[in-house]
Amino acid sequence: MLSLFDTFNARRQENITKSAGGAIIPGQKNTVSIFALGPTITDDNEKMTLALLFLSHSLDNEKQHAQRAGFLVSLLSMAYANPELYLTTNGSNADVKYVIYMIEKDLKRQKYGGFVVKTREMIYEKTTEWIFGSDLDYDQETMLQNGRNNSTIEDLVHTFGYPSCLGALIIQIWIVLVKAITSISGLRKGFFTRLEAFRQDGTVQAGLVLSGDTVDQIGSIMRSQQSLVTLMVETLITMNTSRNDLTTIEKNIQIVGNYIRDAGLASFFNTIRYGIETRMAALTLSTLRPDINRLKALMELYLSKGPRAPFICILRDPIHGEFAPGNYPAIWSYAMGVAVVQNRAMQQYVTGRSYLDIDMFQLGQAVARDAEAQMSSTLEDELGVTHEAKESLKRHIRNINSSETSFHKPTGGSAIEMAIDEEPEQFEHRADQEQDGEPQSSIIQYAWAEGNRSDDRTEQATESDNIKTEQQNIRDRLNKRLNDKKKQGSQPSTNPTNRTNQDEIDDLFNAFGSN
């Protein structure tokens, strides 16, 4: 029988890893032009002007996405003293072939400020005109926030220096990557949220903040050009973080890289954190056993990917779909139940998925609130916890959890409607059990965390009483004012202002009825 189980496990492993084989046939590649600055360009203002020009070309809708991505690569490579070496190290890709052109400054030429595109000694006039003579939709005024009110490039470079200004542009492109692939709808919001930290520490100057439309355009390029994303991921992988001479730009790239790592795998790692690593007794349930075995196989697959494992979703690795929580719904539902109890921030996590197992979700919450389940016997022995301290800790946990005897609802998605539709039946079922004297389920005895209905009725009654009291106060004030008017004289006043006040009093008095 045990050998049969081993066979099943081997079949599951093969189904996940999908053993490779067959011949390697090269595919078609796009030829993409990359532009690097030559040694004749030494002025910092000119370098920054070219950086903004590359960004403008990347936003030009008249160009193909592959070439627009090439201009972004040109901008990213400006962070390095040797762009050719950077592209040789990180630019190997199955989709594109990079061709590097140099931009030089020829003092004998007056057109386009003396800039010229060349390779070795060959000058490309048409390419020069294509880059420097094009009418672009985006310029400094449109691709940067409040461009017309920003300082000039010369002012920014003079104040902050060229490396700092260039780094401000490059780091924003990296921030776009955080959400560009895994969360399209939250791209703009996520970008400005993460950008705020870099604005506060002075990394990104206010005059160089990208506009929201620019962020969306760059995100669109990243989604359509996997070669650009691959280059950026390879940059993170090959960057030697143990070096002592990392530039400021490289350090900031590493900071953003922490957000990019494991992007799209939050459900997988939250399941392991709250479902497996908590090591509660519920893991012994046979219902969870298949999903636990699948998690084990997935973790082995993840580790087999080596340094590229944290980026399987960003790189759109064919196996990244195996890590979706729909492939292990029972243990995921249980883990989310534990999570919403142990970590309040997880109560905002979208758990209302179509594959959510409500029973497992409730079980996770019930187990997480249980004082005995929260204590590890292994750690008790290791730490030398006395019996009295253990009982005291249990008592404290019970006191804390005594006010939380209701289940948290799943948030977002179709499971909310499903839970609400089932709720009246659950209440009715509990009422029948109480009448028949039958024992209640340890799971169903919890209500959804929305407050008792009696509390709602009490709030409504209190609100109604407050309204009646306020109405009575208004009546009393109106009566008092009316009596004062009568005492002043029995004849009605001919003053228009007094007449208006009297009409207003009469209308208000009639609106609330007679006393």
Curated annotation (Swiss-Prot):
RNA binds at K179, K189, R194, Y259, Y349, R353. It is found in: Virion; Host cytoplasm. Changing S493P: In strain: JS. Residues 489-500 have a biased composition (Polar residues). Homomultimer; forms the nucleocapsid. Binds to the viral genomic RNA. N0 interacts with the phosphoprotein (via N-terminus); this interaction allows P to chaperon N0 to avoid N polymerization before encapsidation. Interacts as N-RNA template with the phosphoprotein (via C-terminus); this interaction positions the polymerase on the template. Forms the helical nucleocapsid (NC) in a ratio of 1 N per 6 ribonucleotides, protecting the genome from nucleases. The encapsidated genomic RNA serves as template for transcription and replication; encapsidation by N is coupled to RNA synthesis. Forms the encapsidation complex with the phosphoprotein protein P. Before encapsidation, the newly synthesized free N protein, so-called N0, is chaperoned by P. Together with P, inhibits the integrated stress response (ISR) in the infected cell via the formation of inclusion bodies (IBs) shielding its own newly synthesized viral RNAs. This is Nucleoprotein. It comes from Human parainfluenza 3 virus (strain Wash/47885/57) (HPIV-3).
